[in-house]
């Protein structure tokens, strides 16, 4: 996680103090200062990302990453831009800065609310998400330069498990008595047949922004790439079932189109996400 120069603590969890604001400006180009010198700047939840995330007024978000995490943010910027060029609704980058081991991006805020917090009813949200994911998964995969296959994800998971960075205490109840190493081995030996599509890669409801016009946008796109569609489908239907009840799963699959729900793949990709 990026830290303010001269401190050992992460950025403030609410509105930045004047001193924190000055330290934030000190790591960014002077050309950025006018955009960051007026209005409220708040630290916000960053989800799975190791980057520090700030809301700048009502119109922009700022992400900063330093050290090893900077590479991941650079990848997120590239993948988000690629999706945007394919016509996918994403948060447009206004400014990008990369110097030394620090990367920062200032992006436009998107109209709407995340699918886990929207006030829109299930009969609006469920088909909207299904249509958005179906369209994303229909992008020609040959044009996508980013590999997020099971092999790639298992390799990444192996590093995390070996480094002791996976907390089994947050595993779902079905894996409550399974160690990270045992779960990894199970995933390695029970790989499903993979289909390949362009996926978001971290499609929790918090990363899907639903507008009042029923449009859907994608944020936190650092794991977008070529992968099995169930990389996304499993997470979305799990979130919809928790938010709206099990009937939302049938509604999603009907609106998404294609074959009936593959429960084996759903379970596999939910388990793989435990090591994400």
Predicted regions span which residues?
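ATP-binding pocket architecture of kinase catalytic cores
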Residues: 43-146
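Active-site acidic catalytic loop and adjacent metal/ATP-binding pocket
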Residues: 45-62, 182-231
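Short, structured helix-loop boundary elements
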Residues: 70, 123-126, 177, 181, ...
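An alpha-helical support segment within catalytic cores of ATP-dependent transferases
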Residues: 20-33, 135-201, 260-262
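Charged phosphate-binding loop/patch that engages nucleotide di/tri-phosphates or the phosphate backbone
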Residues: 19, 258-276
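Active-site Asp-x-Gly
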Residues: 70, 150, 193-198, 211-264
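Juxta-kinase regulatory segment immediately upstream of eukaryotic protein kinase catalytic domains
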Residues: 2-39
